[in-house]
Amino acid sequence: MAKGQSLQDPFLNALRRERVPVSIYLVNGIKLQGQVESFDQFVILLKNTVSQMVYKHAISTVVPARPFNVSAHHSSPAPTPAGGFNGQNDETSE
C-alpha cells in the first residue's frame, strides 16, 4: 500500500462498510451524493439512483452525512507529519 493511502483507504472502506451517505465535492464545485459502493487507487464508485465512477483526481472533499468510526477498521495510529507538528500548540503561555 502506498504511503499516501494509509488514511484514505480505511476512511473510504469504513464509509463503504457502514453504508454512510456521503457528499462528494469535485474540484469544479459540483456536489455528488450517494454511498461508496467500491473504490480503488484511482476511482470511487458512488451509488445513488445510478452508479457513478468518480475519478479521485477530480475530488476536492468527501463529507460523511453522519458520524462513523474509522478506527474500528484501522488500528494503526496516524503518523506524525514531517516537521513533527502534532496539532498542539508548542508555544508556552506567560
Curated annotation (Swiss-Prot):
Region listing for Disordered, in residue ranges: 70-94
One example GO MF annotation: RNA binding
CDD domains: Hfq
Xref: SUPFAM superfamilies: Sm-like ribonucleoproteins (SSF50182)
GO CC annotation terms, alphabetical: cytosol
GO biological process: regulation of DNA-templated transcription; regulation of RNA stability; regulation of translation, ncRNA-mediated
InterPro entries, per database record: Hfq, LSM_dom_sf, Sm
Self-association state and partner proteins as the record states: Homohexamer.
Entry function: RNA chaperone that binds small regulatory RNA (sRNAs) and mRNAs to facilitate mRNA translational regulation in response to envelope stress, environmental stress and changes in metabolite concentrations. Also binds with high specificity to tRNAs.
Family to which the UniProt record says this protein belongs: Belongs to the Hfq family.
Full protein name: RNA-binding protein Hfq
Source organism (scientific name): Shewanella woodyi (strain ATCC 51908 / MS32)
